[in-house]
Structure formats: structure tokens, C-alpha cells
Amino acid sequence: GGTEKMANRTYEYNPTGGSPVINVTAGAELKTAVAVLLTKDGAKIPEAGKEATGIVLLGDETVAKGDDITVQIRNQGMWAAGAKIEAGDFLAVDAEGLCQKATTGQYILAMALTPATAKGDIVNVAIIHAGYEA
């Protein structure tokens, strides 16, 4: 028989490794491909232009409060557009959690890799957490 020792497991902190996604609880009803902010009450839509943690992975159309969701926090992902977007635009969150071109004072969560012609289009983005637009 094998000996299974769980007590000696070591966890190494590696800031460049690990997964580009995190599993969290929805703190409100959410649509997929929207940006969320982690709060003590779960993942919620941030205030427009404010800091966001990541983007809910594409899946079911809506997520109920208390559901487990997967949130992408870096690398390339897909974010639903709130307006027309050009490739290369720096993107911030709008009041619905959709992406919009960042304006002065807004938190840049991502950069658009593909354009969007209308609200609801899915934009391929690079999640960059670039801080606030100057």
C-alpha cells in the first residue's frame, strides 16, 4: 500500500505561474463576458470606470447570485462590448460591466485585440491591468 502524507505538502509562491483564471462566487446576478470586481460579498459589477478584477468566462447566458463562476484575471480573454470599439483601444468597464474605450481617469483593465461594431459584440482582449488612464 502507498503511504499518503498530506501534512508535508509545500505550497510555493510563484508570481509568474499559476492559473490565469480564478474560481469565485457570484455576488449578484451576472451575464457572461462581463467584468467583475471581487468583494467580500462575491464577484460584482464594478462602478463604471473603476477597478475590475477580471472578466467572467463565456458560459451560460446569466449567472445567479451564489453560483460558482470562473473569472479570467490575465492573458487573452473575451469581453462583451458596451459600444463600438477599435482594435488597440484601451478598455475600461461601463456601468453594465461591458467594455468601453477608456477615458481620462478610468481604470484600464484590457486592450482590444479585435474591434466591435455594436453593443453586445464579443471583443478579444488582452487583460493588462494597466491602471488609470492619464
Across the structure, where does each feature detected by a protein language model lie?
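Surface-exposed, low-hydrophobicity beta-strand/loop segments enriched in small/polar/acidic residues
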Residues: 2-134
